[in-house]
């Protein structure tokens, strides 16, 4: 007997990568804006989450643009998680541009230019366009000729009569001779389903009407059903772009399709700066669209982590950029206390931010987690990583988290899971965590070893 067996499909969901903040789903607030103790992947930090909830409401109401927020707190207190939760609460339609302070330093592009680029990335433009479309099956296609106005025996096409049929009726259109050229290019014949944009005169052949599907043809045709509704339709198309997209489109016009221009594009890998004049022109066009009601400005969020890495020049530029007419909400994060502002010798300021900018910021403080909160976070994270942890091991990890750091115990979960798997255990035990702890040092133990072997290393 011939052996036949089915190959089981492996689902791709089992191989999704688990990142540091995969478990964050939102701020975890109720309908009154009050933070629940454990919700949306967050544990604790009630005051900070409620403050971010107010900020989200202000952004949605478009009353927050041009203002800046500082998330201040120690390492592993959830500053990046809060910024990520803000972006998830706002949804995919609101631009969210994350970057680290050190990203702004480049050999090719000025620091201020790199900052302005990210500013423009965080501002969206929603363009609404109403398109009038004629769609249907071609029942008649008659070009009408007229005498050539230049004389001679030749004839010119004055207009084209096209009959279109849809499920709800038929229409006969008189089209411009320029549209006839598009019809010829698309090789349209009677029985084809086409649509014509009335604004641009663009013609698109969708396919052959399925009424002709029984015809024998040597060429393989794509048969489509008769369009539903009326022949004349109005469609509203919404496009979401950022101001940076518009800047780039105008700064680098596409070359031709010939070999020379394509080679030219390959030979120019250097990043070109977008001039202030070009941005001003783009802003003018955007303002005109907004006045006409065609477009709507969507101020997004620019998140700058490790803000203490920025220098005094960038901070000075940031002051001016925040006061401009078109500015996003800027969220800064810092885990430093009183330090010298980069680029200065004697200006010591909180969080590494100059005093004049600190005065403009709304500061949200994140607090260290207590033992119970660390325990809840570990159990949540273990569930995300599909790991089972014994109660004793969970208690041990929570105690270890208070002695070392939250990040260290979260990073111990995966190695402990592998050790438990090798020992054929379904759940992670205290012995597995102890073994992983011996294999991987935390920062305090590593520092202690370095101090003891000071003369050796």
Swiss-Prot record:
Q: Which SUPFAM superfamilies match?
A: P-loop containing nucleoside triphosphate hydrolases (SSF52540)
| InterPro entries for the chain | AAA+_ATPase, P-loop_NTPase, RuvB-like, RuvB-like_C, RuvBL1/2_DNA/RNA_bd_dom, TIP49_P-loop
Q: Where is it located?
A: Nucleus
Extract one GO cellular component term from the record: nucleus
Which Gene3D superfamilies does the record cross-reference, listed alphabetically?
1.10.8.60, P-loop containing nucleotide triphosphate hydrolases (3.40.50.300), RuvB-like helicase, domain II (2.40.50.360)
What is an example of a GO molecular function annotated in this UniProt entry?
helicase activity
The UniProt catalytic activity note for this protein reads: ATP + H2O = ADP + phosphate + H(+)
What's any GO biological process attached to this entry? DNA repair
**Which proteins does it associate with, and in what oligomeric form?**
May form heterododecamers with RVB2. Component of the SWR1 chromatin remodeling complex, the INO80 chromatin remodeling complex, and of the R2TP complex.
Q: What does this protein do?
A: DNA helicase which participates in several chromatin remodeling complexes, including the SWR1 and the INO80 complexes. The SWR1 complex mediates the ATP-dependent exchange of histone H2A for the H2A variant HZT1 leading to transcriptional regulation of selected genes by chromatin remodeling. The INO80 complex remodels chromatin by shifting nucleosomes and is involved in DNA repair. Also involved in pre-rRNA processing.
> What is this protein's name?
RuvB-like helicase 1
Q: Which gene encodes it?
A: RVB1
């Amino acid at each position: 007997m011939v052996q036949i067996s089915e190959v089981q499909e492996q689902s791709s969901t089992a191989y999704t990568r688990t990142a540091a903040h995969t478990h964050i789903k939102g701020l975890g607030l109720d309908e009154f804006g009050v933070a629940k103790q454990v919700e949306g992947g967050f544990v604790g930090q009630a005051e900070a989450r409620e403050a971010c909830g107010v900020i989200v409401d202000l952004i949605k109401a478009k009353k927050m643009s041009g203002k800046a927020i500082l998330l201040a707190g120690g390492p592993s207190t959830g500053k990046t998680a809060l910024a990520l939760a803000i972006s998830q609460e706002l949804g995919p339609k609101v631009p969210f541009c994350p970057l680290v302070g050190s990203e702004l330093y480049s050999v090719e592009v000025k620091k201020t230019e790199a900052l302005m680029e990210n500013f423009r990335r965080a501002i969206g433009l929603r363009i609404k366009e109403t398109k009038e479309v004629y769609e249907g099956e071609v029942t008649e296609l008659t070009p009408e000729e007229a005498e050539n106005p230049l004389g001679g025996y030749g004839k010119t096409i004055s207009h084209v009569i096209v009959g279109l049929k849809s499920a709800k009726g038929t229409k006969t259109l008189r089209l411009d001779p320029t549209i006839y050229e598009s019809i010829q290019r698309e090789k349209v014949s009677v029985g084809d389903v086409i649509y014509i944009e009335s604004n641009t005169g663009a013609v698109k052949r969708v396919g052959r009407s399925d009424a002709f599907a029984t015809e024998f043809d040597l060429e393989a045709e794509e048969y489509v059903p008769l369009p539903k509704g009326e022949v004349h339709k109005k469609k509203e198309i919404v496009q979401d772009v950022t101001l940076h997209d518009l800047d780039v489109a105008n700064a680098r016009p596409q070359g031709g399709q010939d070999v020379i221009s394509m080679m030219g594009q390959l030979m120019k890998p250097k990043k070109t700066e977008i001039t202030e004049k070009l941005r001003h022109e783009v802003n003018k066009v955007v303002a005109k669209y907004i006045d006409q009601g065609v477009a709507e400005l969507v101020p997004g969020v620019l998140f700058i982590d490790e803000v203490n890495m920025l220098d005094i020049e960038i901070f000075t530029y940031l002051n001016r950029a925040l006061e401009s007419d078109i500015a996003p909400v800027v969220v800064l994060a810092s885990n430093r206390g009183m330090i010298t502002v980069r680029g200065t010798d004697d200006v010591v300021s909180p969080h590494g931010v100059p005093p004049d900018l600190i005065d403009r910021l709304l500061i949200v403080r994140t607090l260290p987690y207590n033992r119970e909160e660390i325990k809840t976070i570990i159990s949540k994270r273990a569930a995300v990583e599909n790991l089972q942890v014994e109660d004793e091991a969970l208690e041990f990890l929570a105690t270890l988290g208070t002695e070392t750091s939250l990040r260290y115990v979260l990073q111990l979960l995966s190695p402990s899971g592998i050790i438990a798997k090798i020992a054929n255990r379904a759940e992670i035990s205290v012995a597995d965590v102890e073994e992983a702890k011996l294999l991987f040092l935390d920062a305090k133990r590593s520092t202690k070893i370095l101090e003891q072997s000071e003369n050796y290393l």
